[in-house]
Amino acid sequence: IVLGGGVAWWAGRVVKMTDMPQMVAIYNGMGGGAAALIAAVEFARGEVHGPVVATLAVLGSLIGSVAFSGSVIAFLKLQGIMNKAFRLPAQNLVNIALGVAAIGLGAWIVTSSVGAGPANDWLLVLFFVLALVLGAVLTSPIGGANMPVVISLLNAFTGLAVGFEGYVLGNPTLIIAGIVVGASGTLLTQLMAK
C-alpha cells in the first residue's frame, strides 16, 4: 500500500495539469483491472460459493475488465498515441456479439462454479479476453474530445466492479466505496453528456 501510494503521490505531483485526464484514465483502469483480477483469483481458488456471489463476481469481473481496457484506450487517445477513432465494419453488431458472448460465457462460469468446485481455467481466460476486447472495441470509435465523458462513465463502471467484488469478499468498505464511486461517476457522466 505504501509503495502504490508513494508512486501515485509522486505521479500526481509531477504530472502537468493538462495531462490530468490521462492520469485519471490510467488510475481508473487500474482500479477496474484490480477488481476483475480479484474475481479471477476467487474463482480460480474455488472461493466463490453460491449463485448470488458467483453472479456478482462475474459481473464485477466483466465490468472491471471493460473499464480496464476502455481506460487504456482512453489514455492512449488522450496521450496522442492512438490518434484516429477506430471503427469496425458493423461496429454495433460486433459490440452486441461480444457483449452477448461475454454474458453467456459468464453465465456458464456461474453455473459451472456453483457446487462444482473451481471454474475451469480456460473458461476464465476466454471470458476475460472477451471482456477486455469488448472494452477496447466500445471505446475505440469515440473521438478524443469526448474522452472525458467516457472516462467518467468508465469510472462509474469501476465503482460498480469494486462494489460487486466487495460483496464477493464480504468487505463492507469496498461495497461502500464502490457505491460512492459508481454513483458519482454516473452523475458526472450525465452532467457532462448534456
Each model region followed by its residue ranges:
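Transmembrane helix-loop junctions at the membrane interface of multipass transporters and ion channels
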Residues: 41-49, 111-118, 144, 149, ...
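C-terminal ends of transmembrane helices
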Residues: 5-24, 71-85, 134-147, 189-193
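Loop-to-transmembrane alpha-helix initiation sites
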Residues: 51-62, 123-127, 169-184
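Helical transmembrane-bundle signal
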Residues: 32-38, 42, 64-77, 99-109, ...
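Transmembrane alpha-helix boundary signature
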Residues: 10-20, 36-51, 73, 112-116
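Alpha-helical transmembrane segments in multi-pass membrane proteins
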Residues: 3-4, 8, 12, 31-34, ...
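Cytoplasmic-side transmembrane-helix entry/capping segments in multi-pass membrane proteins
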Residues: 19-31, 85-97, 147-156
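Glycine-rich phosphate/diphosphate-binding loop of Rossmann-like nucleotide-binding domains
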Residues: 77-98, 109, 115-117
